[in-house]
Design a protein with these regions (language model features):
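ALDH superfamily catalytic-core signature
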Residues: 1-117
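Conserved C-terminal structural/oligomerization subdomain of aldehyde/semialdehyde dehydrogenase
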Residues: 101-233
């Protein structure tokens, strides 16, 4: 069986419960120092709620890098074309120390960036507690950008949405090329199944034909059961 790459795009739509969204994102992104393929990678936040939501995230444990700190991260992120192994799976405070910042309280690092350069490394799976943060004009732009990003890396995997709009959820289901949409839940603890949703619990998530997978659901024991189909005329 083939399983696709994770690169989870999280959309915060303007009707979202911001306290729930902020708590869930920090909980999800900091879990196991963001080594899960279902860990939040990019946050797309609507302009109308952007400043307010960044403040909520900061209150929950986000450290948003300034331009000088972003340049320092850019300089140490790669070694010989690959992610610096000294940073992978390390907690936020350790990464910040390497940027000259002493902060033991932060759980997640935010890298604010525009959507003009989608080839930038922060738009890809990173395996450390750093999130790309992007301001979008509206929910339609968010869906278009989310699809563009997942089609570059993470096609067919998953997308997270924080919203109270059933209309937007339905639209996302029609527009997104992903096998699962995780609604109002900590993504890394939910995409692989949890007590709070009906998904089968697994570490192997199918990505469908989008991601060149054999399955588009969570791998389960039933996938290994042989079945005999009795066919009568």
């Amino acid at each position: 069986m083939v399983f696709g790459t994770g690169n989870e795009i999280i959309i915060i739509e303007n009707s979202a419960d911001l306290n729930l969204a902020a708590s869930s994102i920090i909980e999800s992104k900091s879990f196991d120092n963001s080594t899960s393929c279902s860990s939040d990678s990019v946050l797309l936040i609507e302009d109308k709620i952007y400043k307010k939501f960044i403040n909520r995230l900061s209150n929950k444990g986000l450290f948003k890098l300034n331009n000088k700190q972003k340049k320092k991260l850019d300089n140490i992120f790669f070694i010989k074309g690959t992610i610096n192994p000294k940073l992978i799976a390390k907690p936020a405070y350790f990464i910040l120390e390497n940027l000259g910042v002493k902060n033991n309280d932060s759980k997640v690092i935010g890298y604010e960036i525009s959507s003009k350069n989608l080839d930038h490394y922060v738009f890809k799976e990173k395996l450390l507690p750093i999130c790309a943060i992007v301001k979008v004009k509206n929910s339609l732009e968010a869906l278009e950008l989310a699809n563009n990003l997942t089609n570059k890396e993470g096609k067919g995997h998953s997308c997270g949405i924080y919203t109270e709009s059933e209309k937007f959820i339905d639209l996302a289901g029609k527009k997104m090329d992903v096998s699962r949409l995780i609604i109002n839940q900590p993504h890394s603890k939910s995409a692989g199944g949890s007590n709070n949703n009906y998904l089968n619990t697994t570490l192997s998530l199918g990505c469908g034909a989008w991601g060149e997978s054999n399955i588009d659901h969570n791998l389960f024991y039933e996938d290994f059961c042989n079945k005999t189909l009795i066919v009568k005329k």
